[in-house]
C-alpha cells in the first residue's frame, strides 16, 4: 500500500516502523504515524504552526462543521454497502491533506473501511494520529507515496486538486470525493470583514482523466460562541492572509458570530 518516498519500492511494516527492499527505513513516531518525506526538516518547516494546528483541532472538536463530517461519513457508508467486495476485505480510503484528522477518523470508524490519511505538516499528522481509526503519515501530495490504484475511495477537503496523483492512486472502479466551499460559506464572516461582501465562486475542478458523476450541497447556519472560535475559523480561510489589519480588527471585537456554512461535495470516477 505505502511506498518508499526515495525509491518508490513497497514499504513493509515492522516493530519500529517501515522499510523497503532498497534499505531505506522510516521510524514510527510515538503517536503511531510514519514520516514519509525525503527531508527530515520539511515537516516542521511546512504546514501550519503548532498553535494554529491545535486551534483548528479545538474548533472542529466543538462540532461547528459536524454537518459536513456527517455527510462524508454517510457517503462512505453508502460506498461500503453498495460496493462491498465478495472477499469480505475492507474498502480502502485515502484522505488527502487530512489536517488534524477530524474527518479522516470519522470516515475510518465506518465498519468495513481501512482508512489512511496524510498531510505535509508534521504537527497536523501528530494530532491526527492521536484520534485513531486510520493510518496516518507525513507526505507531499505532489508525489504521494502509495501504490497505483490502491484506494477504493479518495477524499480531499479544501486541498489543491492534483488530478495526476489523485487519479493515479484511485482504484479503477473507485470514487474520488472533493469538497469546495459553497457560494454562501462563511458569508456572515465576510459581512463583518468587508463593506461589500461577495459570494464564493462555486468552481469545481475541471478534469480530463476523471468524470464528474454527482454533487451534493451541505449547508447550515451556525453561531460561533467565542472569540477564539471566530479567530480559528478565520485562520482556516484563504482570505485570512489577504485581509487588511484594519478589517481584521472588526472580527477581534466580536465575542459571537452567526454565519452560514456551505459546502459542495463532488464525486468523480475514472472515465
Model segments located where?
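A short acidic, Gly/Pro-enriched loop at the edge of an enzyme's catalytic core
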Residues: 142-153
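Class I SAM-dependent methyltransferase Rossmann-like catalytic core
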Residues: 47-71, 75
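Conserved Class I S-adenosyl-L-methionine
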Residues: 190-212, 218-271
Amino acid at each position: 500500500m505505502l511506498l518508499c518516498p526515495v525509491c518508490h519500492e513497497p514499504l513493509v511494516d515492522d516493530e519500529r516502523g517501515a522499510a523497503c527492499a532498497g534499505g531505506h527505513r522510516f521510524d514510527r513516531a510515538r503517536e503511531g504515524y510514519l514520516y514519509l518525506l525525503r527531508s527530515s526538516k520539511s515537516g516542521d518547516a511546512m504546514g501550519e504552526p503548532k498553535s494554529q494546528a491545535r486551534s483548528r483541532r479545538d474548533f472542529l472538536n466543538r462540532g461547528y462543521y459536524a454537518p459536513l463530517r456527517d455527510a462524508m461519513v454517510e457517503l462512505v457508508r453508502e460506498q461500503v454497502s453498495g460496493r462491498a467486495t465478495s472477499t469480505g476485505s475492507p474498502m480502502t480510503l485515502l484522505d488527502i491533506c487530512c489536517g488534524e484528522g477530524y474527518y479522516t477518523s470519522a470516515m475510518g470508524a465506518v465498519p468495513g473501511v481501512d482508512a489512511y490519511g496524510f498531510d505535509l505538516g508534521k504537527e497536523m499528522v501528530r494530532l491526527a494520529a492521536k484520534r485513531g481509526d486510520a493510518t496516518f503519515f507525513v507526505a507531499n501530495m505532489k508525489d504521494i507515496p502509495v501504490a497505483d490504484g490502491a484506494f477504493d475511495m479518495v477524499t480531499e477537503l479544501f486541498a489543491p486538486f492534483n488530478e495526476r496523483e489523485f487519479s493515479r492512486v484511485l482504484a479503477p472502479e473507485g470514487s474520488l470525493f472533493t469538497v469546495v466551499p459553497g457560494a454562501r460559506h462563511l458569508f456572515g464572516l465576510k459581512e463583518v470583514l468587508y463593506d461589500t461582501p461577495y459570494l464564493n465562486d462555486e468552481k469545481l475542478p475541471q478534469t480530463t482523466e476523471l468524470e464528474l458523476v454527482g454533487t451534493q450541497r451541505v449547508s447550515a447556519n451556525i453561531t460561533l460562541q467565542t472569540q477564539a472560535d471566530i479567530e480559528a475559523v478565520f485562520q482556516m480561510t484563504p482570505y485570512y492572509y489577504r485581509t487588511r489589519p484594519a478589517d481584521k480588527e472588526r472580527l477581534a471585537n466580536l465575542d459571537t458570530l452567526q454565519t452560514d456554512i456551505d459546502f459542495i461535495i463532488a464525486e468523480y470516477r475514472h472515465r
